[in-house]
Amino acid sequence: NGEETEDKFYKVYEPLNVEKGFRFSYTPAGKKPQRYINGLSELKAAYHKMNSEEEKEWQRTHDDDKPYKEKKLPEAFICSGERDSLCCQSMGYHPLWFNSETYSLSAEEYREIMKYVEVLYNIPDIDETGRRKGTELALTYIDIHTVWLPDWLASYKDNRGHGRKDLRDWMAKKKKKKDFKNLMANALPARFWVEWLTKDGKKKYEIDTACLYNFLSLNGFH
């Protein structure tokens, strides 16, 4: 596919280390780029693999000279960390995650991701920081579909007495893939209008009421 081979690095966990700042580290030192999206390399590989297989099938079933047109993967999910990403992948989806919850996705990084997928979902934590960052991302890139986990999840406590807040916690209560698909079905973008071309080539716009309510809610109107 013509892309450069990336340097490999590993994240080492020491969850029982008494020093919180040393519970994980990266090795070899200096190999991890300053900005890095975990899962993006795997997403690209899945995209190229799918299109390679689709193109072979196209060539097998088409005798004309019409070239094969590359297709995007249906979706990918921004998750809030490794645990959530493993849960997402266990259901057959492509996870992406950042090195910290406060990471700001750049416009260039967003465009790069959207080369490979039709829809990008975000599954933020439902604590204060997660809601704030999830709202911020939704309003920055208005085509991202935000999967808000249900409020009832926070009524369950972890071993430190804190409310449950992430996808891994949710999957401890809802293990069926159809439950996750229901979450996906309720995920909305902040873009509240749709556009299409008429038969004579004119562009038309229409308000999507559900997305408009979502946009207003993201901006603090309830």
Can you name each region flagged by the protein language model?
Residues 1-116, 134:
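Phosphate-handling DNA/RNA-contact segment within nucleic-acid enzymes
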Residues 132-143:
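Short, aromatic/basic amphipathic alpha-helical patches
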Residues 139, 155-197:
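Short, small/acidic-rich helices and loops at N termini and domain boundaries
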Residues 99-104, 125-126, 151-153:
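Short, acidic/turn-prone active-site loops that include or flank metal/cofactor-
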Residues 188-222:
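N-terminal nucleic-acid engagement/recognition segments and initiation subdomains in replication
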Residues 74, 85, 92-95, 119-121, ...:
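Conserved NTP-binding/hydrolysis core of motor NTPases
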Residues 104-112, 132, 156-167:
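Short, charged, surface-exposed secondary-structure boundary motifs
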Residues 76-78, 117-129, 148-151:
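Acidic beta-strand-to-loop metal/phosphate-binding motif
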